[in-house]
């Protein structure tokens, strides 16, 4: 499923190519690209839920009035999916104002819905980018995240 999300994001959304509204046409194109129907439907449902998150003011996605000094306590299931490196990266993104409490919760929600036994920091970065792309008013945060995703480290790290 994550491969399909990446394919869609890279080929349609991120490249600013007009995405087809017709789900059947899009499904057929994905089948021609080698993806299976079950995984395609899961990926499209994942994207629909992502779009729905920004259209609701139901908590926890919009955490208005929450102090930024509070730490997020992760459930056992979230800890199993998001390792220490991923959780640390989410905290870093909040500290540099790429994410706020509501977008962080959107990211966690979308991560938990990914049907994959393995999830790594690179996958998390793409989910963050997809979430920020879909939230109006987060263009600056999206650009910052894009820089973080595509920047190459300079020199050797010690």
UniProtKB/Swiss-Prot annotation:
Pfam annotation, one family: DUF494
Biological classification of the source: Bacteria, Pseudomonadati, Pseudomonadota, Gammaproteobacteria, Alteromonadales
InterPro entries xrefs: Smg (IPR007456)
Family: Belongs to the Smg family.
Domain of life: Bacteria
Source organism: Alteromonas mediterranea (strain DSM 17117 / CIP 110805 / LMG 28347 / Deep ecotype)
PANTHER family hit by this protein: PROTEIN SMG
Name of the protein described by the UniProt record: Protein Smg homolog
